[in-house]
Curated annotation (Swiss-Prot):
This is Coproheme decarboxylase. It comes from Thermus thermophilus (strain ATCC 27634 / DSM 579 / HB8). Involved in coproporphyrin-dependent heme b biosynthesis. Catalyzes the decarboxylation of Fe-coproporphyrin III (coproheme) to heme b (protoheme IX), the last step of the pathway. The reaction occurs in a stepwise manner with a three-propionate harderoheme intermediate. When reconstituted with heme, can generate oxygen using chlorite or hydrogen peroxide as substrate (in vitro), but has very low affinity for hydrogen peroxide and chlorite and extremely low enzyme activity. It catalyses: Fe-coproporphyrin III + 2 H2O2 + 2 H(+) = heme b + 2 CO2 + 4 H2O; Fe-coproporphyrin III + H2O2 + H(+) = harderoheme III + CO2 + 2 H2O; harderoheme III + H2O2 + H(+) = heme b + CO2 + 2 H2O. The active site is at Y145.
Length: 249
């Protein structure tokens, strides 16, 4: 039997990412005195302004989304240069007065990742650098889902030679490039960090584009044979005014 020679993908890592999904106890929130709700709002607004200042200083990015369906009400999406500032962002939200009305529904921790199957990428490349530290769009919609590469029988991604993986990913990338200008994609790796191997964020001004790109990519061999997908979350970006309206203030 021929011995399998491991050929791991070359990766570059960027910002750390936390998808923090929360449920809002609407009954408790609206039964609270207006003064208490206003105080909670002012504290939350101050926290978000701190996140905005960090983004403007190039020390991270953020987005808050109203999530459709029963899986969550809000997504607090934060990107930071390391785990420690990401933990601080999570803790600050959890210690806030607004958190008294929130419950945790799902979370995913990962690190922005760029991969090359055959040769290392140049971290100083003007093409590579911005993709390692992406800025979350401040409008439109997000679609997030975790995924794995299959390791089952003959469909074992990790047993494929690097050249074959490269060929499959190239075809997959060509499908994605059809949506350039319509969908922004951020891939983050989570091997050893969370329960799935990757997180995928899609950003668009038109949520129907999420359906189109995911459906078309399902026909790529790399997805049809080797892709395993977790839950999908779709949300609408909330600026300060929209977030306040969502909270009924």
């Amino acid at each position: 039997m021929e011995r399998h020679v491991p050929e791991p993908t070359h990766t570059l890592e960027g910002w750390h990412v936390l998808h923090d999904f929360r449920l809002l106890d609407f009954a408790r929130w609206f039964s609270a005195p207006l003064e208490a709700r206003e105080d909670a709002w002012e504290e939350l607004k101050g926290l978000v302004r701190e996140w905005r200042e960090l983004e403007e200083a190039g020390q991270g990015s953020y987005g808050i989304y109203q999530v459709v369906g029963h899986k969550a009400d809000l997504l607090f999406l934060n990107l930071r240069p390391g785990l420690d500032p990401l933990l601080e962002a999570e803790a600050r939200l959890s210690r806030s007065a607004f958190a008294r009305y929130l419950g945790r529904s799902y979370s995913f921790y990962s690190v922005v990742e760029l991969g090359s199957q055959e040769k290392p990428l140049d971290p100083e490349s003007p093409y590579v650098k911005p993709r390692l530290t992406p800025r979350v769009p401040k409008s439109g919609y997000v679609c997030f889902y975790p995924m794995n590469k299959r390791r089952q029988g003959q469909d074992n991604w990790y047993m494929l030679p690097a050249k074959e993986r490269a060929s499959l990913m190239k075809a997959h990338g060509e499908t994605g490039r059809k949506y350039q200008g319509k969908v922004m994609q951020v891939i983050s790796g989570a091997q050893g960090l969370d329960d799935w191997e990757w997180g995928v964020d899609l950003f668009s001004e038109d949520p129907v584009q999420f359906k189109k790109i995911v459906y078309e990519m399902r026909f790529d061999e790399v997805s049809a044979r080797y892709g395993e997908f977790g839950p999908f979350f779709v949300g609408k970006y909330l600026d300060e005014e929209a977030l306040r309206a969502f909270l009924g203030l």
